């Protein structure tokens, strides 16, 4: 993979549980935090950045520090997101969240008698709410104390996290208040209402949503369920990566004709994960790299909202104006800046970022519909776009798994986007 290199010092992450507890107590912060750095102007010509990966420690054999039940104090420390906590989250969400399949995409490679394909899809669009967000939302709320659940929760989201929190809260019998932007897709607003959540509308920027949610949490005593800058939410999203590694291992075992109970070496692989605020990207990166240090994890952003690329390239959180990120059709990735916790984790675990154009996104939506019979929203198609149109920027060998984050799109809007994709060369 041809990635431009730059110097970066991975953040120190304590491994001792007692040290983690002390650091957590010391670093509990306000619900809204001023983002480090100022807008410095996106370089739209840059396609990707290289992220040096620190050595990945062996999986811990001690109990994880992620407590449960939790108070409504936020768990901000990146050290709380570990393979152990992600495995624990997988047990908590079992039976609520779908273990989405790995689907082969495209034709088998020539001359392969086993019919193996290089590209695989992880369609989180098949979740009960049509997106991966139920994972983090359910785990977050389920591990709150009974007292906190009785008081209720508040969240801010452009759509899919809102649906995840609304559904999780309904399943757990918890009051939910959701702060949404005035330009949120209608279909997502309707589904949040259907699950019984109260909706508060604000302006289009993520800062406005975060500030209003923090205000409601303070006034009404609600627990904030963060969309991405929240260790519990990130941990829940990381279960996607855990499943990918397990499913690829099972696939290799079957294709190698290894008897049940036998062992086979997992072939090299790459995971493409969308980056918005960084919740799923950081959770998946932690899970995958903790299990397979030789795996490659690449983030994918719209070129019109590539703040994470700039942040990781510059070694500080860079903010893009709301009117700039608002240009992309990928509404789930219109965050103006990456979260503080995801930033720390991605600096340590992510291998690189690829950006995709608007035409590439809609063309990927067309290909998903035609070849995989999957209905994807624009944000759900960015990783497939990276595979289809930027394969030369990825490792030359091994399987490539694209995480398709969601499929919540208004039918009329979906038809318009497909028509645009066909016109662009679909």
Stretch-by-stretch model annotation:
Residues 6, 45, 52, 63-426:
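PLP-dependent amino-acid enzyme catalytic core
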Residues 2, 23, 45-47, 60-64:
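Low-acidity, Ser/Thr- and Arg-rich intrinsically disordered low-complexity segments
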């Amino acid at each position: 993979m041809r990635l431009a290199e730059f110097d970066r010092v991975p953040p120190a992450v304590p491994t001792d549980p007692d040290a983690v507890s002390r650091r957590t107590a010391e670093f509990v912060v306000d619900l809204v935090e001023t983002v480090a750095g100022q807008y410095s102007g996106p370089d739209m010509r840059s396609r990707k950045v290289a992220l040096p990966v620190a050595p990945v420690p062996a999986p811990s054999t001690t109990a994880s520090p992620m407590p449960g039940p939790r108070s409504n104090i936020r768990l901000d420390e990146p050290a709380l997101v570990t393979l152990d906590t992600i495995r624990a989250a997988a047990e908590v969400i079992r039976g609520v969240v779908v273990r989405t399949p790995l689907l082969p995409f495209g034709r088998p490679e020539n001359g392969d008698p086993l019919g193996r394909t290089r590209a695989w899809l992880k369609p989180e669009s098949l979740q009960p709410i049509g997106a991966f967000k139920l994972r983090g939302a359910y785990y977050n709320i389920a591990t709150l104390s009974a007292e906190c659940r009785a008081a209720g929760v508040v969240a801010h989201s452009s759509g899919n996290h809102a649906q995840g929190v609304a559904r999780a809260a309904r399943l757990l019998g918890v009051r939910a208040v959701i702060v949404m932007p005035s330009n949120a897709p209608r279909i997502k607003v309707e589904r949040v209402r259907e699950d019984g959540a109260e909706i508060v509308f604000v302006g289009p920027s993520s800062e406005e949503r975060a500030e209003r949610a923090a205000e409601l949490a303070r006034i009404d005593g609600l627990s904030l369920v963060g969309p991405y800058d929240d260790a519990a939410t990130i941990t829940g999203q990381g279960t996607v990566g855990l499943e990918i590694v397990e499913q690829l291992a099972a696939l290799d075992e079957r294709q190698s004709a290894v008897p049940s109970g036998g062992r086979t070496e997992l072939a090299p692989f790459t995971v493409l994960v969308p980056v918005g605020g960084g919740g799923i990207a950081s959770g998946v990166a932690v899970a995958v790299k903790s299990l397979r240090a030789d795996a490659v994890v690449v983030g994918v952003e719209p070129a019109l909202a590539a703040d994470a690329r700039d942040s990781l390239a510059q070694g500080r959180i860079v903010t893009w104006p709301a009117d700039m990120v608002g240009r992309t059709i990928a509404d789930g990735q219109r965050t103006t800046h990456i979260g503080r916790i995801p930033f720390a984790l991605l600096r340590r675990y992510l291998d690189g970022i690829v950006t995709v154009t608007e035409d590439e996104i809609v063309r990927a939506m067309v290909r998903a519909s035609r070849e995989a019979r999957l209905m994807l929203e624009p944000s759900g198609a960015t990783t497939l776009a990276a595979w289809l149109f930027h394969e030369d920027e990825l490792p030359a060998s091994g399987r490539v798994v694209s995480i398709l984050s969601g499929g919540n799109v208004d039918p009329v809007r979906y038809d318009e986007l497909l028509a645009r994709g066909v016109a662009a060369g679909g």
